[in-house]
Swiss-Prot record:
Protein name: 2-dehydro-3-deoxyphosphooctonate aldolase
Main location: cytoplasm
Membership in a protein family: Belongs to the KdsA family.
Subcellular locations according to the entry: Cytoplasm
Amino acid sequence: MNAPISAAPVVTAGSVRFGNQLPLAVIAGPCQLESRGHALEVASALKEIATRLNISLVYKTSFDKANRTSGSAARGLGLAQSLPIFAEIRSSLGLPVLTDVHDASQCAEVAQAVDILQIPAFLCRQTDLLLAAAATGKVVNVKKGQFLAPWDMANVVAKITGAGNPNVLATERGVSFGYNTLISDMRSLPIMAKTTGAPVIFDATHSVQQPGGQGTSSGGQREFVPVLARAAVAVGVAGVFIETHPDPDHAPSDGPNMVPLAQFEGLLRTLMAFDALAKGQAADAIR
């Protein structure tokens, strides 16, 4: 059975190819960059898993969580300390790296050390930020704002492609549904693919976030990550975005919605099976 999602140009980041009808790719890593040692530990573990499963992997982490609920919350190592770590992960492990940018002034410098610049959902309509990211020529992954309809992403993506950069990914990460709650409308995946012409990614961990749900921090329901991820992959997406951590309950941010690293490989095996079915691959490709 062919996937209902529209084909799109293939976007390449390092050795990873994203396409709505290509085999599933994964973007994974901890929410924020906690230390060099922690980053290399998690990146190495993820590379081993990806190699065993023969799945393409981009490592993600954030140098600055600039939109934390509380002003006193941990934000990450910051730009100066993080860029050498990103470069080391790329050179020593051979993994493409993704990180967020929050201001137009950051884009050119960050682009020297990573493969994908990510635009946070809250900032997805900030034209100057989008244009600065586009100007780097790097792949730009735009998170759909929790306040946007899926078809509204067409204008967002057009700002980047109109600036001469065709290397865009569009990511669904849930839509606001009342206070402290997000829901995922799986119709948005084929709608975004059709209206933006971009490979579509599903963010399975931020989609179960409960924004501000713990007063001074966001809550989450990580037990529903596999449920939503399976549903999205069954539609037929280019990739999944999954935050993972060796000890989520003691992570400095987004712990309630991150997948424990020990459970990550099992989840990926399941998603690869769903992906093979959704994209009409031979049954013997499912294992």
